[in-house]
């Protein structure tokens, strides 16, 4: 709470990060095609565990293979480097979806496959980029450093990335760290929080 009268309490449902490595982009769970990563970059909130994702050819990408179905949400924190665009991609054997995001202003560009997209501004030029797709036979989640809207043709350039998450459902929850296996965060519980007299459709 920000003071005695205003503020908010975030209570989240149970959720599982299906990404086996959420922030170790150098590990083998992250397959790299014409890209490389370097560690210990300055990240969200002044952290020092962000990564520089660089491409060495057109259509360079990094991806994690995860088999799932139904509504799934892929999110990653991204900041511009020498390139000012990123493309997020959810690959399915039946119907894939992607979106381009402008890292100068957080606005979305070209999308395909009718995804639901949200971009959340963070501190120091970072954005949490979120894409949701409801489809069958999802098999991998990709990040492309992009040269411009609808353009990954350049042969060099970089962006910063941090804190990837894949979760079942139609929206992103707060970040759940993983290291080698999926991790579940239990639902939040608020005890002694009052009654219907305090929290109802008109107040609270």
Label each residue range with its predicted role.
Residues 1-204:
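Extracellular and organelle-lumenal recognition/adhesion modules and their flexible linkers in secreted
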């Amino acid at each position: 709470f920000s003071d005695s009268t205003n503020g908010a309490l975030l209570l989240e449902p149970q959720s599982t990060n299906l990404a086996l490595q959420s922030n170790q982009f150098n590990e083998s769970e992250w397959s790299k095609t014409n890209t490389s990563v370097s560690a210990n970059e300055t990240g969200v909130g002044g952290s020092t565990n962000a990564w520089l994702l660089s491409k060495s050819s057109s259509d360079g990408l990094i991806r994690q293979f995860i088999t799932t179905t139904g509504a799934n949400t892929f999110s990653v924190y991204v900041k511009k480097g020498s390139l000012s665009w990123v493309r997020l991609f959810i690959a399915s054997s039946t119907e894939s979806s992607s979106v381009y995001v402008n890292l100068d202003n957080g606005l979305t560009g070209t999308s395909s496959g009718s995804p639901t997209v949200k971009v959340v501004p963070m501190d120091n030029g970072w954005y949490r980029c979120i894409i949701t797709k409801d489809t069958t036979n999802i098999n991998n989640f990709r990040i492309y450093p992009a040269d411009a809207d609808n353009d990954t043709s350049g042969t060099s350039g970089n962006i910063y990335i941090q804190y990837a998450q894949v979760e079942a459902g139609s929206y992103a929850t707060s970040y759940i760290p993983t290291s080698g296996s999926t991790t579940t965060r239990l639902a939040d519980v608020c005890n002694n929080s009052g009654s219907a007299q305090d929290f109802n459709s008109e107040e609270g």
